[in-house]
């Protein structure tokens, strides 16, 4: 209702800052301070593993989370924009944080599992360049809008 709509902005801001503070030890935070409803990490802090933002995004799929916007803004080489919604429960947000910590740990102990993700999806990692140059939308098993 009318009273609850006033909480949309503050809740989105609270959620974003909570996630940022919880993950800043594992992920590089290029801009310090309070954020609004979104913030950007610049990949993992430990760059020695060779695990990229794309790898982290694909690994999130294995854990049932939609990958965030990646490689935007172009200001940062390994940008990962985290933009939690205002209506996520604390349990859901804590689950996301736990998975992000786990992926950071996997990157240190078994980087190949992160680099090879996703493992649990029907379609594995897509060759983005080939898909852009030679799309085969007719191969899709879902015949919507074709």
Feature map (PLM): residue ranges:
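Non-catalytic terminal extensions of PLP-dependent enzymes
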Residues: 2-146
